């Protein structure tokens, strides 16, 4: 709840007038503040020391302590610590990078390999992702990736657009790969794209703890072309209600299929899917905002190694 309050009120001090619109920087959305986690992986997989980065107040945390989220930053990354059968392994696909006098964020699609006593036995494709929400650490398996997240933050406003700076680098191949770690690596048809995914939901919970949602607003964009120079003040309009017949609508803006639902923590403290059941009406107001920036789109463990997206100054326009 405190993150929703931070986003909805305290950012007013960071608002800027641009033309007739008022822009609010999402807290820590200038990516100038990073927390560092230093974790020793288990000896049986090499015992390497890994550095994981999180968008949060400057700090250094040493040791394999689970990290859910910051109490003041709404962001979480796909940088994560896993513990499987007592073995500690880290995955790193999000990085701070210098930009002018500050920093930006780079998300990158990578291949993570795990060797046990020098023998390769697990290879996983990992897209770099930042999002608003939390992560349930330590990760214990690769099943149902969405259930590892508490996706979204409390939010009741209705912005016109998301605005950000970006640049992109991609190999530009017309196929992707799928590598889950426990099965054969296979080719997947189609070019990979980075994705900026923003939805506003009106959520509610029934007496049994099930959570449902109406989709209030949608703003999704896929980027698949090399953009070597920064594109500043890029605007992504939020479409309210069913976007099907609205300008800017895309086929991938539909409601989330039940089997791919986001997850949240219900009032009983249990991680449950958020089932989208319809589009919002004109009188509906959102209860939650979910924003995700990823170097690859679509299902987990699918993408093109080498996709890189740099993002900076993520804000909401009103």
Where are these predicted regions, by residue range?
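Interfacial segments of alpha-helical transmembrane regions
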Residues: 180-186
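Aromatic (Trp/Tyr/Phe) and Gly/Pro-enriched flexible surface segments
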Residues: 16-159, 163, 189-241, 252-317
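Extended, low-complexity, turn-rich repeat/linker tracts enriched in Gly/Pro/Ser/Thr and Asp/Glu
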Residues: 168-175, 186-191
């Amino acid at each position: 709840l405190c993150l929703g309050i931070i986003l909805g009120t305290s950012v007013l001090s960071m608002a800027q007038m641009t033309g007739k619109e008022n822009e609010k920087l999402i807290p820590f959305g200038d990516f100038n503040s990073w927390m560092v986690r230093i974790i020793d992986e288990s000896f049986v997989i090499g015992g390497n020391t890994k550095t994981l980065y999180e968008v949060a107040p400057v700090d250094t945390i040493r040791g394999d302590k689970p990290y859910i989220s910051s109490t003041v930053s709404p962001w979480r990354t796909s940088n994560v610590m896993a513990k499987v059968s007592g073995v500690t392994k880290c995955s790193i696909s999000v990085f701070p990078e210098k930009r002018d006098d500050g920093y930006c964020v780079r998300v990158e699609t990578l291949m993570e390999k795990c060797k046990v006593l020098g023998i390769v036995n697990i290879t996983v494709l990992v897209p770099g992702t930042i999002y608003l929400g939390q992560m349930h650490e330590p990760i214990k398996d690769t099943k149902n990736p969405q259930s590892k997240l508490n996706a979204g933050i409390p939010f009741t406003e209705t912005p016109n657009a998301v605005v950000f700076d970006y640049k992109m680098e991609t190999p530009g191949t017309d196929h992707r790969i799928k590598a889950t770690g426990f099965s054969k690596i296979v080719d997947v048809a189609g070019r990979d794209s980075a994705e900026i995914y923003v939805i506003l939901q009106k959520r509610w919970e029934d007496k049994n703890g099930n959570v449902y949602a109406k989709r209030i607003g949608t703003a999704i964009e896929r980027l698949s072309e090399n953009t070597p120079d920064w594109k500043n003040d890029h605007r992504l309009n939020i479409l309210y209600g069913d976007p099907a017949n609205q300008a800017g609508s895309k086929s991938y803006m539909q409601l989330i299929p039940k089997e791919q639902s986001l997850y949240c923590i219900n009032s009983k403290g249990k991680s449950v899917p958020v089932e989208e059941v319809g589009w919002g009406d004109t009188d509906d107001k959102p209860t939650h905002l979910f924003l995700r920036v990823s170097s690859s789109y679509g299902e987990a463990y699918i993408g093109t190694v080498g996709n890189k997206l740099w993002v900076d100054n993520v804000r909401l326009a009103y």
